[in-house]
Amino acid sequence: MADRIASVERNTLETQIKVSINLDGTGKFNCVTGVPFLDHMLEQVARHGLIDLDIHAVGDLHIDAHHTVEDLGITLGQAFDIAVGDKKGIKRYGHAYVPLDEALSRVVIDFSGRPGLEMHVPFARASVGGFDVDLFSEFFHGFINHAKVTLHLDNLRGKNTHHQAETIFKAFGRALRMALEADERMAGQMPSTKGSL
């Protein structure tokens, strides 16, 4: 399998974002977005997905974090789409259950080429660490539309908003790792009966 790396820049009147990823990394993480709780969540993706992430974002945070969070999802999705390449030889599907104390979340992903998001996370509070939890949906919509994946996010139980969010992002990282692993029995083959994804 060729090197699965990508660097993408997005520059608008609202944000300037640069994302570099290595899908076959060790979980190295360097991230400055100006949104500390989001940085904390993205670190979970890197560590649990064994994906090297280097992210630098400057956004119009004097308004709120909406544009920064959404555009980061878009840019990260674009980077994944490039790094994954033609998808030959990958497992394609990934899933993970992750607990953290009272919270339990399940994430299932399909590198299907068809963007779709089902997010069912009944957050206990509207914000955590100064972060508006509504923005998680904006992040994941940006990601799925540009990574071209189908993503199901379910928080099955939880009372602590931080724990709910953290289990989602840890499970997201682990599901990515599973889906993107090389399948030795499918080496060089497309993981679809259609012959393309």
From Swiss-Prot:
<keyword id="KW-0963">Cytoplasm</keyword>
<dbReference type="GO" id="GO:0000105">
    <property type="term" value="P:L-histidine biosynthetic process"/>
</dbReference>
<dbReference type="InterPro" id="IPR000807">
    <property type="entry name" value="ImidazoleglycerolP_deHydtase"/>
</dbReference>
<dbReference type="InterPro" id="IPR038494">
    <property type="entry name" value="IGPD_sf"/>
</dbReference>
<comment type="pathway">
    <text>Amino-acid biosynthesis; L-histidine biosynthesis; L-histidine from 5-phospho-alpha-D-ribose 1-diphosphate: step 6/9.</text>
</comment>
<keyword id="KW-0368">Histidine biosynthesis</keyword>
<protein>
    <recommendedName>
        <fullName>Imidazoleglycerol-phosphate dehydratase</fullName>
        <ecNumber>4.2.1.19</ecNumber>
    </recommendedName>
</protein>
<comment type="similarity">
    <text>Belongs to the imidazoleglycerol-phosphate dehydratase family.</text>
</comment>
<keyword id="KW-0028">Amino-acid biosynthesis</keyword>
<dbReference type="InterPro" id="IPR020565">
    <property type="entry name" value="ImidazoleglycerP_deHydtase_CS"/>
</dbReference>
<dbReference type="InterPro" id="IPR020568">
    <property type="entry name" value="Ribosomal_Su5_D2-typ_SF"/>
</dbReference>
<keyword id="KW-0456">Lyase</keyword>
<dbReference type="GO" id="GO:0004424">
    <property type="term" value="F:imidazoleglycerol-phosphate dehydratase activity"/>
</dbReference>
<dbReference type="Pfam" id="PF00475">
    <property type="entry name" value="IGPD"/>
</dbReference>
<dbReference type="GO" id="GO:0005737">
    <property type="term" value="C:cytoplasm"/>
</dbReference>
